[in-house]
Curated annotation (Swiss-Prot):
Organism of origin: Exiguobacterium sibiricum (strain DSM 17290 / CCUG 55495 / CIP 109462 / JCM 13490 / 255-15)
Keywords: Ribonucleoprotein, Ribosomal protein, RNA-binding, rRNA-binding, tRNA-binding
A Pfam family hit: Ribosomal_S13
Gene this protein is translated from: rpsM
The protein's name in its UniProt record: Small ribosomal subunit protein uS13
Function, as annotated: Located at the top of the head of the 30S subunit, it contacts several helices of the 16S rRNA. In the 70S ribosome it contacts the 23S rRNA (bridge B1a) and protein L5 of the 50S subunit (bridge B1b), connecting the 2 subunits; these bridges are implicated in subunit movement. Contacts the tRNAs in the A and P-sites.
């Protein structure tokens, strides 16, 4: 397995697909990096030379990936919480941030249902 940006990428897959195993690299970013490095998208990871791997590493150094990207996202969320804006409040309460309805759904964000016991009359 080749190791790029601290991630072991699969050897048997096409390089454009293998690069998407890196957090922050989707298909479009992978295609741009490969085009910049002059490597065909159909090349298998095992067929790459050490020089080509170094070109890929240099290309990915220009893009925020893995730890840097995760850190930036968490700092952005902390900043929103700290300034007390609406989005920050939604993050703090664990509710959907982007305006979705919460009456019936939003289970992903809220977690499993907490049943409330009924009072006997």
């Amino acid at each position: 397995m080749a190791r790029i940006a601290g991630v072991d990428i699969p050897r048997e897959k096409r390089i454009v697909i293998s690069l998407t195993y890196i957090y922050g690299v989707g298909k479009t970013t992978a295609q741009k990096v490969l085009k910049e490095a002059g490597i065909s998208e159909d090349t298998r990871t095992r067929e790459l030379t050490e020089e080509q791997l170094n070109q890929l590493r240099d290309g990915l150094d220009k893009v925020k990936v893995e730890g840097d990207l995760r850190r930036e996202i968490s700092l952005n969320i902390k900043r929103l919480i700290e300034i007390g804006c609406y989005r920050g409040v939604r993050h703090r309460r664990g509710l959907p941030v982007r305006g979705q309805n919460t009456k019936n759904n939003s289970r992903t964000r809220k977690g499993p249902r907490r049943t409330v016991a009924n009072k006997k009359k």
